[in-house]
């Protein structure tokens, strides 16, 4: 979406095939985050977690030391609010601007420039990146000037997403155990009050027997872990989140951590899941 909007895009990824694919579309490949940082005035980091964000910025080949003063760092991983707050302070000490900007929407919406972005940062940083956000997202929610506010909202989104996926899996598992036709059950629930966005989006993966990861089980092990760690510090109970977290942990422990998060349905005993279709995966 950035290339379509006319930006000069420099890209780095640990997977050469990913870089090559974007270069074919007109981007310029970089051999390291440091090399990339030396060529850009806005650095958009789309990685999985805090550790990867840290490595991109402050690792042996980190970008932070190469960015010019006044450059903007936009970090979009789902991380704890505390990490985002501390990151903002570290970047400010380097005279860099920071936007805490976790995203929602997945790879398809990212490619189409239709993501939702939950962002917090200074008005000056947003002003510099207005055209960039116009290119990558359909909805930009400006949630304040302090880093961490965007990550707090993303954390709550992930609480709901994880609980809804776990609930959808549990509902389908009980339906299969009860002898319901899986596709008929999906059709009825999709048009009834029990439906949710996650039910409508994830249950087709179960019906097709296709657990090719679009968002993996281990993502929700991480994200619900962030939710529970944050709540624990203020002695705040989250019984549904805790149960959903245990379900994803159980799926991961059984060897399904790298599969699509809908594979949490595989933890339920005594049911026969739909087999992979000809176009499906494993």
Identify the residue ranges that each predicted region occupies.
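Rossmann-fold NAD(P) dinucleotide-binding segment
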Residues: 33-98
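Interdomain hinge/lid region at the active-site interface
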Residues: 151, 160, 195-257
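Hydrophobic beta-strand scaffold residues
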Residues: 9, 29, 97-99, 140, ...
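Beta-strand segments within the central parallel beta-sheet cores of soluble alpha/beta enzyme folds
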Residues: 181-191, 242-246
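NAD(P)-dependent dehydrogenase/reductase Rossmann-like domain
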Residues: 249, 253-282
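Active-site-proximal catalytic alpha-helix in oxidoreductases
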Residues: 112-113, 117-119, 141, 147-178, ...
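Rossmann-fold dinucleotide-binding core
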Residues: 78-158
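NAD(P)+-binding Rossmann beta1-loop-alpha1 motif at the extreme N-terminus of oxidoreductases
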Residues: 1-46, 71, 110
């Amino acid at each position: 979406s950035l290339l379509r909007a006319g930006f000069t895009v420099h890209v780095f990824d640990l997977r050469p095939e990913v870089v090559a694919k974007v270069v074919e579309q007109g981007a310029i490949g970089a051999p390291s985050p440091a090399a990339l940082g030396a060529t850009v005035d806005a650095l958009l980091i789309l990685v999985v977690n805090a550790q990867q964000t840290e490595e991109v910025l402050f690792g042996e080949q980190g970008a932070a030391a190469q960015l010019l003063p006044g450059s903007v760092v936009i970090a979009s991983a789902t991380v704890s609010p505390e990490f985002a707050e501390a990151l903002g302070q570290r970047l400010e000490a380097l005279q860099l601007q920071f936007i805490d900007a976790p995203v929602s929407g997945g790879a398809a919406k990212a490619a189409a420039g239709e993501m939702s972005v939950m962002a917090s940062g200074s008005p000056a940083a947003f002003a510099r990146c207005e055209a960039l956000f116009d290119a990558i997202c359909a909805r930009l929610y400006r949630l304040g000037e302090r880093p961490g506010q965007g990550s707090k909202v993303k954390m709550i989104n992930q609480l709901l997403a994880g609980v809804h996926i776990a609930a959808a899996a549990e509902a389908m598992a009980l339906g299969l155990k009860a002898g319901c036709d899986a596709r008929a059950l999906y059709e009825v629930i999709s048009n009834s009050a029990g439906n949710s966005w996650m039910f409508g989006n994830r249950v087709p993966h179960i019906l097709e027997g296709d657990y090719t990861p679009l968002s993996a089980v281990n993502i929700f092990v991480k994200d619900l872990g962030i939710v529970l760690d944050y709540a624990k510090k203020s002695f705040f109970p989250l019984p549904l989140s805790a149960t959903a977290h245990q379900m994803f942990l159980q799926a991961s422990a059984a060897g399904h951590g790298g599969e699509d998060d809908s594979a949490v349905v595989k933890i339920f005993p005594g049911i026969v899941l739909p087999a992979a279709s000809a176009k499906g995966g494993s």
